[in-house]
């Protein structure tokens, strides 16, 4: 069951709009090729895309879109062509060309709400519900991703500000990082136990040099004994 305004007449004095109402693809194409505006409106603000979509004429919808019809156009009540749809293929075409499934008209009604009011078939309702669910999930993923991006940017900005306020700290961190890398490479090349042995030899040499220079053995109490 497609959606048509109850008080509407099926007649109009605009040839292109009448062709869309009648589902006359050939005449619609001829008019568009002759220069008719694909976005021309009727007295309610509806374009040919609204009228063709309401009647499930997906071929004419595709034709209008090819000639530049605006899929986002709304009538004077804020309805897009999707608000008037009652056919699966027409809905799929409009959504694939940029129409949001959760868009509201001036009364706050979405295409799904209007479809339920009109009593369209269950396949259409299920499709609209599925598309709305996908839209919500996509929005949640997008919001989560944006939040993570903002948090990362704030963290990087804070680190950059800290580095600018403490330039010596940044330089010191660079030197420390370079030393750490060099030390790790040295240990890997020489081997842990050889490095340990080298450190022990250096320590013993240091003790020997200290004794040679001062004549005092380190760690030995050389205070003279008191004679009673």
UniProtKB/Swiss-Prot annotation:
GO cellular component: membrane
SUPFAM superfamilies: Ankyrin repeat
The keyword Iron belongs to this UniProt entry's keyword annotation: no
Pfam families: Ank_2
Subcellular compartments: Membrane
InterPro entries hit by this protein: Ankyrin_rpt, Ankyrin_rpt-contain_sf
Entry membrane topology: Single-pass membrane protein
Keywords attached to this entry: ANK repeat, Membrane, Repeat, Transmembrane, Transmembrane helix
Each ANK repeat, start to end: 11-40, 44-74, 77-103, 107-138
Primary location: membrane
Entry superkingdom: Eukaryota
TM region(s), chain numbering: 195-215
Identification of the protein by name: Ankyrin repeat domain-containing protein 46
Organism: Mus musculus (Mouse)
Gene: Ankrd46
């Amino acid at each position: 069951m497609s959606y048509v305004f109850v008080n509407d007449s099926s007649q109009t004095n605009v040839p292109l709009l009448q062709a869309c109402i009648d589902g006359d693809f050939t005449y619609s194409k001829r008019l568009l090729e002759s220069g008719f505006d694909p976005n021309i409106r009727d007295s309610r603000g509806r374009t040919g895309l609204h009228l063709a979509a309401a009647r499930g004429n997906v071929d004419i919808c595709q034709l209008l879109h090819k000639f530049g019809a605006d899929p986002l156009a709304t009538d004077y009540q804020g309805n897009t062509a999707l608000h008037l749809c009652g056919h699966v293929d027409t809905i799929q075409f409009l959504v694939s060309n940029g129409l949001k499934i959760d868009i509201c008209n001036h009364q706050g009604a979405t295409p799904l709400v209007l479809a339920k009011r009109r009593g369209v078939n269950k396949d259409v309702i299920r499709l609209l519900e599925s598309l709305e669910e996908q839209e919500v999930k996509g929005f949640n993923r997008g919001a989560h991703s944006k939040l993570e991006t903002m948090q990362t940017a704030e963290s990087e900005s804070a680190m950059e500000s800290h580095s600018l306020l403490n330039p010596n700290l940044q330089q010191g961190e660079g030197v420390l990082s370079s030393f750490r890398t060099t030390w790790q490479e040295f240990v890997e090349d020489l081997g842990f136990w050889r490095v340990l042995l080298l450190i022990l030899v250096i320590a013993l040499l240091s003790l020997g040099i200290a004794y040679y220079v001062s004549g005092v053995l380190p760690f030995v109490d050389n205070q003279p004994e008191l004679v009673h």
